[in-house]
């Protein structure tokens, strides 16, 4: 195999969750709220015939750009916990735009704080997820991703009834520090996701910032500022949750959770699902055998030591951090949520 082909395999963006072999004619339904940059990993690796996508983006310019990209159905709405009128602050860096005012005394401790300064304000009318569902503008959603710079909890509150009945998973941006005035923090979002929606936390992709400094090159990690948290429907309560649905819907939800756990690399979760005592209530024996073979195949990786080697790990970890990308030296983030298979390695 030549070098270029090897590199092509190494950086192949295909995701093993979206194989036609395990789609069984079903599609996972994704709701992406705050979709400015388009569909993110791992969902961006799915084929059109395995995924239905609804993108929600209140910024009219960005919503038009998403429509032109034809990634899915675009709803140019602002979502909240009630139908009301809000002011959207369009900041110097559009990705920091929010209905919350920036907390400048906090942000000015770090570099490049001016990107949070508002250059324009627009008035937006908000809707709630529960209202959209009642009006049939959205149907059965399996997975939701929310990234709206502080407004995540309000959106979850506005869709509590719908989300409790439909979600198998949630990826949501959470803040550990008050980047915006009066915004909810991780503890608030986490409590709501667990207690109100019945989900459980599985992973967090964390982002760190370093205080402004000009004389010395500091260590890589700074203060934990924000992250992307992944929540999944618990195995322990899954059968009870699914049993309240009709046969078609419960089978779809079971399949969506299987695909989601594979997509994020939680194969132990996938295995627990398909080998559970209740799995055959929601998947036939033939499809179950296909899934078992698929998991057996994709779980294989390069494991030279059955329990690892702490000395070699430490050496490679030091080398890895020496080359880790940063944002101008003062901000860095973990690569992704969950585990991702690259070439013959799970990372």
Regions found by a protein language model. Give the residues of each.
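Phosphate/nucleotide-binding beta-alpha loop and adjacent structural elements of enzyme active sites
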Residues: 1-347
